[in-house]
C-alpha cells in the first residue's frame, strides 16, 4: 500500500489527511476507524457500485462494532442535482444521523461530489471519508475538497470546498470498471503530465498499453503520482485563488460540451480530452506551442481511445456556456493554455478571433 498525505495549512492549525492507495484495501476498515467518532456511519453509494461492494464493506465495518446506514442513489452524471442531494438528506434525517455521524462516499466522482456537499451542509458540517471506485475519482475528484452539484445552466455551479478526513483508493475496484470509464480516468492522469510534469507525460506515453490492460503496479504508480501532484497543488492553493486553476486544463471547453450534449452522454474525462485539444489548438495559434506538441497530445489521446474532436455546437453556444464558467473574472473568460508539455498558464486575453476560428475549424458535427 502507498500513502500520499495532503497537508493543508490554515489558521490557527494545520490540517491534513491521508490518501491510501493499494489493492484490496477496501477490506481493511482499520484504515478509517480512527476517523469514525461514533459507532454509526452513513454509506452513500449508487445502484452500480452498491451491488458490487456495499454489503462486504458493511460487514467488514460491523466486525469492529460499526452500524452502517446504506444510502443508494441512482447512477449517472444526470443525477448530480438537488433532487438526488435531497435523497441523502432525507435518509440522514430519517435515521437521525448526528453531527458526528460520518458519511462515507463509496463510488465514483458523482457519489463523492454529492456526499461531500451533503457532509458540508448537513447540520452545518459533518465528517466524511472518500472511498473512490473509479480511476477518475481516485486520481482527481476525491482529493482536494471540491464538492457540489450541477445546475441546468452549468456544471458544478453549486457547491462547497470541504475536505475529507481520509481517502481510500482501492485499485482492485478498477477490475469492475467499464473500459470507457477507465479511459475517461486516464484523461485526468494525462492532465497532470501536461500541466506540470513532462517526465510523467513521457512515462504515460510509454506505459499507456499497460494502463489500458489494468496492470496493477502501473495503475498504482499512476494513481500515486497523480495524487502527489494534486496534493501539492491543493496544499499551495486550497480555494483555487491561483495555481489550482491550472488543474482545469480542458475543463472550460469540456464543461460546455458536457452541458450542451446532456450530462452523462459525454463522460467527464472524454469532454476534458476533447476540450484539451481545443485548448492546445488555441495555444498553438497564439504562438505558445508548436504543432509537434499538439500532435503528441492528440496521439496519446487516440492511443487511449479518447475523443480528440469536440462536437460542433457553434461558437456562439460555446461562448455562452463558457461565460458561465467558475473561472470567469470581471466578465472575462480565463483559459488554461499550454506553454509546452509540462507547463500551463492562465490567460484572460485570448483574442476573440482565435476562439471563433478554433471553435469553427476544430470541431465536427456529433
Curated annotation (Swiss-Prot):
This is 3-dehydroquinate synthase. Binds 1 divalent metal cation per subunit. Can use either Co(2+) or Zn(2+). Belongs to the sugar phosphate cyclases superfamily. Dehydroquinate synthase family. SUPFAM superfamilies: Dehydroquinate synthase-like. Coiled coil: none annotated. NAD(+) binds at residues 75-80, 109-113, 133-134, 146, 155, 173-176. PANTHER family: 3-DEHYDROQUINATE SYNTHASE, 3-DEHYDROQUINATE SYNTHASE, CHLOROPLASTIC. Its EC number is 4.2.3.4. Keywords: Amino-acid biosynthesis, Aromatic amino acid biosynthesis, Cobalt, Cytoplasm, Lyase, Metal-binding, NAD, Nucleotide-binding, Zinc. Zn(2+) binds at residues 188, 251, 268. Pfam families: DHQ_synthase, DHQS_C. The keyword Zinc applies. InterPro entries: Dehydroquinate_synthase, DHQ_synth_AroB, DHQ_synth_fam, DHQS/DOIS_N, DHQS_C. Its cofactor is Co(2+); Zn(2+); NAD(+). The keyword Transit peptide does not apply. Disulfide bonds: none annotated. It catalyses: 7-phospho-2-dehydro-3-deoxy-D-arabino-heptonate = 3-dehydroquinate + phosphate. GO terms for cellular component: cytoplasm.
Amino acid at each position: 500500500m502507498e500513502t500520499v498525505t495532503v497537508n493543508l495549512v490554515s489558521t490557527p492549525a494545520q490540517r491534513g489527511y491521508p490518501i491510501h492507495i493499494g489493492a484490496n484495501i477496501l477490506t481493511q476498515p482499520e484504515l478509517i476507524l480512527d476517523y469514525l467518532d461514533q459507532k454509526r456511519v452513513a454509506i452513500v453509494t449508487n445502484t452500480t457500485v452498491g451491488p458490487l461492494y456495499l454489503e462486504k464493506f458493511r460487514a467488514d465495518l460491523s466486525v469492529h462494532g460499526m452500524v452502517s446506514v446504506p444510502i443508494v442513489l441512482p447512477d449517472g452524471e444526470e443525477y448530480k442535482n438537488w433532487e438526488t442531494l435531497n435523497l441523502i438528506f432525507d435518509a440522514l434525517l430519517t435515521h437521525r444521523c448526528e453531527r458526528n455521524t460520518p458519511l462515507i462516499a463509496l463510488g465514483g466522482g458523482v457519489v463523492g461530489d454529492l456526499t461531500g456537499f451533503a457532509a458540508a451542509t448537513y447540520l452545518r458540517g459533518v465528517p466524511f471519508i472518500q472511498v473512490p471506485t473509479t480511476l477518475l475519482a481516485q486520481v482527481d475528484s476525491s482529493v482536494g475538497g471540491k464538492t457540489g452539484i450541477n445546475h441546468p445552466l452549468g456544471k458544478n455551479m453549486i457547491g462547497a470546498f470541504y475536505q475529507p478526513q481520509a481517502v481510500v483508493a482501492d485499485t482492485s475496484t478498477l477490475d469492475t470498471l467499464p473500459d470507457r470509464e477507465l479511459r475517461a480516468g486516464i484523461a485526468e492522469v494525462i492532465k497532470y503530465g501536461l500541466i506540470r510534469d513532462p517526465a510523467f507525460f513521457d512515462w504515460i506515453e510509454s506505459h499507456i498499453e499497460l494502463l489500458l490492460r489494468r496492470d496493477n503496479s502501473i495503475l498504482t504508480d499512476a494513481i500515486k503520482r497523480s495524487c502527489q501532484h494534486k496534493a501539492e497543488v491543493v496544499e499551495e492553493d486550497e480555494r483555487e485563488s491561483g495555481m489550482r486553476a491550472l488543474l482545469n486544463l480542458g475543463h472550460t471547453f469540456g464543461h460546455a460540451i458536457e452541458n450542451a450534449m446532456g450530462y452523462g452522454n459525454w463522460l467527464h474525462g472524454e469532454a476534458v480530452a476533447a476540450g484539451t485539444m481545443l485548448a492546445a489548438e488555441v495555444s498553438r495559434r497564439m504562438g505558445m506551442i508548436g504543432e509537434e506538441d499538439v500532435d503528441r497530445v492528440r496521439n496519446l489521446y487516440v492511443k487511449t481511445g479518447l475523443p480528440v474532436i469536440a462536437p460542433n455546437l457553434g461558437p456562439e453556444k460555446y461562448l455562452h456556456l463558457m461565460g458561465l464558467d467558475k473561472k470567469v473574472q470581471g466578465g472575462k473568460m480565463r483559459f488554461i493554455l499550454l506553454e509546452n508539455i509540462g507547463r500551463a498558464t492562465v490567460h484572460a486575453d485570448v483574442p476573440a478571433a482565435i476562439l471563433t476560428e478554433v471553435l469553427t475549424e476544430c470541431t465536427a458535427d456529433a
